[in-house]
Design a protein with these regions (language model features):
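C-terminal, well-structured catalytic/ligand-binding subdomain of enzymes
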Residues: 2-176
């Protein structure tokens, strides 16, 4: 996957995490035609890669040295969550954290301001499964899928609640 990504022309900025069933994982960031990659495996000292909506790899930060306050806060929330759970994280703990509303967690409901959680996924590459929750709300339930089974073609009614964000979360803050 990494070799294919390195040759792929990407015309927008993204943070992408790719992983496989052998315990290899990479954070791939693109920014204005540039690409940076950080890879880990089961033998690496670092055992987690994560990103929000700003560059986190040192090679790209000079090209985008500021980020929205909400992106930095969510990144810091992930860092703190991982620090609190050094001995291991269950899927249930991860799901609860993902659905915790911002600013304490990651879930955002500011849809009219173009900033809302549309879906939350927990993937298990070893088992070949994923759990999905629409709208970042526990009321919508988690739906489990196995990669070896056909994905159902279906629609579902979900509940979302639009809120208005404090404008300060859209301010830019320096990353350096």
């Amino acid at each position: 996957a990494l070799s294919m990504l390195k040759d792929m022309p990407v015309a927008y900025n993204l943070n992408l995490i790719v992983l496989d069933r052998e315990g290899r994982c990479a954070l791939v960031e693109t920014l204005d035609g540039r690409m940076a990659v950080k890879a880990i495996d089961s033998d690496s000292g670092e055992q987690a890669l994560y990103a929000t909506n700003h560059p986190v790899l040192e090679e790209l930060i000079p090209y985008e040295p500021k980020a929205f306050v909400h992106s930095i806060r969510r990144y810091d929330n992930i860092t703190a969550f991982l620090e609190r759970h050094k001995k291991g994280i269950t899927a249930g703990q991860l799901k609860d954290f993902f659905l915790t509303p911002y600013p304490e967690g990651l879930s955002c409901s500011y849809y009219s301001q173009f900033f809302g959680t549309t879906k939350t996924m927990v993937l298990d590459p070893v088992r070949g499964s994923l759990s999905l929750c629409w709208g970042g709300r526990p009321e919508n339930g988690w739906h489990d899928f196995n990669f070896s089974d056909p994905f159902p073609q279906e629609t579902a009614a979900i509940e979302i609640h639009n809120q208005t964000a404090d404008p300060s979360i859209f301010a830019y803050r320096s990353l350096v």
